[in-house]
């Protein structure tokens, strides 16, 4: 199967949603799904579904629908969801603690293997109820040196985000999901995905206000 390497970011962001939909269809024992069924489940139009799928070659035949099991496995391969991906969490404040207790592995094959915070944080040296150890940030390089961990969730205050990012990159981290509302400078080969809760809420309020004006 030929995959177009120049996949738009908007399409890339929908990949996990497609995977979730096909897993749901599979659980409901749906064998074939049309682009309209997929679109309705996603809250988008069927033309967007067909355009997204076109980047991955021939996923289905027009008029026959899409094989649910085949597509579920395809997206599992694409998202590397056949094997468990271990990640670390850096910053055990309110958001960080909530994420430490979130059971990623119940929904996907991802799990937080370790938490990190400032060396003097009271949580350092303890474990969560799910047996996740919390370490001091100064030990991050040695802690992940002999592991397969390349991904970090960053939930530190904005003023510390860049410094901690530099430490993570030096330790070998290649991907960062950042909750800090600042732009992070990273070298080529390191990917940052930002989650700005304030921005998302403001966007929601904007669209709500637009609805009131209509």
From Swiss-Prot:
Tree of life domain: Bacteria
DNA-binding region: 17-56
Single GO molecular function: DNA-binding transcription factor activity
The keyword Transcription regulation is annotated on this UniProt entry: yes
InterPro entries reported in the protein's UniProt record: CoA-bd (IPR003781), NAD(P)-bd_dom_sf (IPR036291), Rex_DNA-bd_C_dom (IPR009718), Tscrpt_rep_Rex (IPR022876), WH-like_DNA-bd_sf (IPR036388), WH_DNA-bd_sf (IPR036390)
Gene Ontology cellular-component annotations: cytoplasm
GO biological-process terms attached to the record: negative regulation of DNA-templated transcription; response to redox state
Residues annotated to bind NAD(+): 91-96
Subcellular location: Cytoplasm
Keyword Repressor on entry: yes
UniProt entry keywords in alphabetical sequence: Cytoplasm, DNA-binding, NAD, Repressor, Transcription, Transcription regulation
HAMAP family per the UniProt record, alphabetical: Rex
Binding partners and assembly: Homodimer.
Function of the molecule: Modulates transcription in response to changes in cellular NADH/NAD(+) redox state.
NCBIfam families recorded: PRK05472.1-1, PRK05472.1-3, PRK05472.1-5, PRK05472.2-3, PRK05472.2-4, PRK05472.2-5
Family: Belongs to the transcriptional regulatory Rex family.
UniProt-recorded name of the protein: Redox-sensing transcriptional repressor Rex
Organism: Streptococcus pyogenes serotype M4 (strain MGAS10750)
Lineage: Bacteria, Bacillati, Bacillota, Bacilli, Lactobacillales
Gene: rex
